[in-house]
Design a protein with these regions (language model features):
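Acidic beta-strand-to-loop metal/phosphate-binding motif
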Residues: 99, 163-171, 456-458
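Residue-level signal for well-ordered alpha-helical positions
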Residues: 180-181, 200, 216, 274, ...
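Alpha-helical scaffold elements adjacent to nucleotide-binding pockets in ATP/GTP-utilizing enzyme cores
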Residues: 174-177, 212-216
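Short, basic/hydrophobic alpha-helical segments
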Residues: 88, 145-163
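Conserved "right-hand" nucleotidyltransferase catalytic core of DNA-directed polymerases
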Residues: 1-141, 186, 204-208, 216, ...
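Phosphate- and divalent-cation-binding pockets in alpha/beta enzyme and binding domains
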Residues: 173-180, 343, 468
Length: 469
């Protein structure tokens, strides 16, 4: 009977081991609290640390890495002429696998200038190809380097060859940069996406569960990469990568390529050993170039509609400010938590004010909602003021500034590894948090429009959002 399959008691030991191995600390605590006997620490195999599955790799790939020589930046080559580049291209074709990386003038792949490309075909076998070094001074002497268009023409057969696997770390960025130079990189592997498919949500050996180059290098290779700030500086003293001396630029860029090569050698076998091949090969790897194309294509927005909404919001904000000042009995800076707290609890005398360590009253949303529920009209007005101010600054104004002057579209960046659920997340600008349940939020969403003859389709299946729209 069906009742025979009913789970009457949760088997504690295997569940506790599973929860601890995967970092579900809150659930593990609840499991301990629900037991009749005193809580005890789950004892795993002492020879196998917690989360060892993310570090001790089956299939011998860890051993393969151990057999490699340590990273030696002095072995890297700076490729400054066509003959040397031809040699590296020949080496990549012979290896049938090459790790690659691009260096650019900015983080925005849609507008950044290509400064250089690095390649790696094995341990200690890495190079940097400078393309646009020397700064923008027309009269300054430029370092010897291959002309950009000529270098792309030489590299294009390699980057587009089906006979050579190209490996990137966050390859989507590099695909977008090179696509703007007429090059479609394929086939590709992406070590960042591999790491996400294998270790999403895990905090490993105290290093953290991120999937960036520096974290992966330290976690899996025990290697500390050169930091970008150590190459380009920070603040007012920061320089563009194109002004970094070639010897230093070569160390930084070629290291990225070699680290990517080593990470691929480690992570690729884990996919098959740990059952991750199906998801990676059938879903996430094919999705990388698709999402890259989505970013390049961008989203059309109605600038006039946004400007109109922004003006309406500004008018409403000004009206609310006047009403709030009238209720307070004096003008003050509404956006200042300190001044707002003093008005609410000292001047107007509302009860329940609590001061934090800084000595000022808390005026977060929960406090204002409580006061609103108790009949404080000024709290209601401040909540409305905050909402409109945020919508105006975050969306109606910011989206207008985000419109690319060349394409006339907004080119957001979609992260494949930004959400543990597997959903895409959006940044620069963030498009996923635009309100949908309010009329104001819907007005902002209506500013996103389709090209003439097209429609925007929203797809949903059984209340589960699809990975790509």
């Amino acid at each position: 009977a069906l009742d025979d399959f009913k789970l009457t008691a949760i088997p504690h030991e295997p569940l506790a081991v599973f929860l601890e191995e995967h970092g579900f600390n809150s659930l593990l605590k609840r499991l301990g609290e629900g037991r009749g006997s005193p809580e005890r620490k789950v004892q795993l195999n002492p020879a196998k640390p917690v989360n060892a599955g993310a570090v001790v790799v089956p299939g011998g790939s860890r051993q393969a890495l151990a057999e490699l020589p340590p990273i030696d930046r002095s072995l890297y080559a700076c490729v400054q002429d066509e003959e040397a580049l031809a040699g590296w291209i020949e080496r990549a074709f012979a290896a049938r696998l090459v790790a690659f990386d691009t260096e650019t003038s900015a983080l925005d792949a849609i507008s950044a200038d290509l400064v250089g490309i690095s390649l790696a075909t094995g341990p200690g076998q890495a190079c940097y190809i400078p393309l646009s070094h020397g700064g923008t001074d027309m009269f300054a002497e430029k370092p010897r380097q291959i002309e950009l268009a000529r270098a792309i023409a030489l590299l294009k057969p390699l980057l587009e060859s089906d006979a050579v696997l190209k490996v990137g770390q966050n390859a989507k960025y590099d695909l977008n940069v090179l696509a703007r130079h007429g090059t479609t990189v394929s086939p590709i592997d992406d070590t960042m996406v591999m790491s996400f498919d294998l270790d999403a949500g895990r905090s490993i050996d105290g290093i953290g569960g991120g999937h960036g180059m520096d974290e992966l290098a330290m976690r899996h290779l025990g290697h500390s990469c050169i930091a970008f700030k150590d190459v380009c500086g920070t603040g007012k003293k920061a320089i563009p990568f194109g002004e970094v001396p070639l010897d230093r630029a070569t160390e930084y860029a070629a290291e990225d390529a070699e680290v990517t090569w080593r990470l691929h050698r480690l992570l690729k076998p884990r996919l098959s050993d740990e059952g991750g091949t199906r998801v990676y090969e059938r879903v996430d790897r094919p999705l990388v170039p698709v999402v890259a194309q989505m970013e390049r294509h961008g989203i059309k927005v109605d600038r006039e509609a946004l400007a109109g909404l922004s003006a309406t919001f500004a008018s409403e904000i000004g009206k609310l400010e006047g009403e709030i000042h009238e209720l307070a009995g004096q003008p003050f800076t509404i956006g200042s938590p300190k001044q707002l707290g003093e008005i609410l609890f000292d001047k107007l005398g509302y009860k329940g004010g609590k001061k934090g360590k800084t000595g000022q009253y808390s005026t977060d949303q929960s406090v204002l909602e409580r006061l609103d529920g108790e009949g404080a009209p000024v709290a209601s007005k401040v909540l409305e003021w905050r909402q409109l101010s945020k919508l105006r600054s975050t969306y109606t104004e910011a989206l207008q500034e985000a419109i690319n002057p060349t394409t006339g579209r907004v080119h957001t960046s979609y992260s494949l590894v930004g959400a543990q659920t597997g959903r895409l997340s959006s940044t620069e600008p963030n498009l996923q948090n635009i309100p949908i349940r309010t009329e104001i939020g819907r007005q902002i969403r209506h500013a996103f429009v389709a090209d003439q003859g097209n429609v925007i389709l929203a797809a949903d299946y059984s209340q589960l959002e699809v990975r790509a729209d």
